[in-house]
Amino acid sequence: MKVTFEQLKAAFNRVLISRGVDSETADACAEMFARTTESGVYSHGVNRFPRFIQQLENGDIIPDAQPKRITSLGAIEQWDAQRSIGNLTAKKMMDRAIELAADHGIGLVALRNANHWMRGGSYGWQAAEKGYIGICWTNSIAVMPPWGAKECRIGTNPLIVAIPSTPITMVDMSMSMFSYGMLEVNRLAGRQLPVDGGFDDEGNLTKEPGVIEKNRRILPMGYWKGSGMSIVLDMIATLLSDGASVAEVTQDNSDEYGVSQIFIAIEVDKLIDGPTRDAKLQRIMDYVTTAERADENQAIRLPGHEFTTLLAENRRNGITVDDSVWAKIQAL
């Protein structure tokens, strides 16, 4: 089905206010959920909202909490999210990293005791729109087996890198072949995954999203490489924030909350002039996209460039929402 941005935001806002969230906070949170969905990231927008409300009702998320600065070391700061609303706090933390970068050339904010930030790409994009390189990542509850194991002991720990090119170039990727959100999107659409995304119950690689959702044997991105990246990203976020690791979040908490996150902004213009920056970026993009195609009907893609098209289509034609997901939200 199709809904407008206004309908989507109003639905989110209604549910948030009915759960006791104050009107200003509810409006800002609903806006971010709606913007994420409008951008085409359904898995971490509308599809994720019922799960967000469940955690709000369970007390994992404290809606009136505010992040608190703990330590300041010039370009590096350490903050405690105090289990505040994840997407609103993440936006504030990237804004703070940008402020630090404006003074120092680079800014790094390490955040502990945080909640799920929903679409991580929003915060990299936020920096790139202002002319900064944006880098951020988060750890999570253990939802992926390390390479060679059957039992979940590492997080998908998504990493975002956004570049202020025209259009913005951005990688937003979990350390698994697919996020659990994308498994859900494909299952709801009745589609197999385009490539193997995990193992079935017999240990064979599979493209069936429902099987992987159930047995949790999701495949690390690049096999052992994604497994290794997940571990070191967790270590860095834990040390810099003095926060909880994947092991602590999984073993000590009743659900996925109290995670650790990193936000980095780099002011490119302190290192290179604008025309030179633009020319270098354009040469990179042209060199990549003019490669001989494996399939003449399939253009070479640059990461993140599709979001401009998806956003325009959703604004023109309405936002696609799965019927069953919309019914869940209406029933909240």
Curated annotation (Swiss-Prot):
Sequence similarity: Belongs to the LDH2/MDH2 oxidoreductase family. DlgD subfamily.
Major enzyme class: oxidoreductase
Protein name: 2,3-diketo-L-gulonate reductase
One GO term describing the cellular component: cytoplasm
Sites where the protein binds NAD(+): 168-174, 224-225, 304-306
Species whose genome carries this gene: Escherichia coli (strain SMS-3-5 / SECEC)
Key words, A-Z: Cytoplasm, NAD, Oxidoreductase
PANTHER family the record matches: 2,3-DIKETO-L-GULONATE REDUCTASE (PTHR11091:SF3), OXIDOREDUCTASE-RELATED (PTHR11091)
Gene of this entry: dlgD
Localization per record: Cytoplasm
Listed InterPro entries: Diketo_gul_Rdtase (IPR023689), Mal/L-sulf/L-lact_DH-like_ah (IPR043144), Mal/L-sulf/L-lact_DH-like_NADP (IPR043143), Mal/L-sulfo/L-lacto_DH-like_sf (IPR036111), Malate/L-lactate_DH-like (IPR003767)
MF term (GO), any: 3-dehydro-L-gulonate 2-dehydrogenase activity
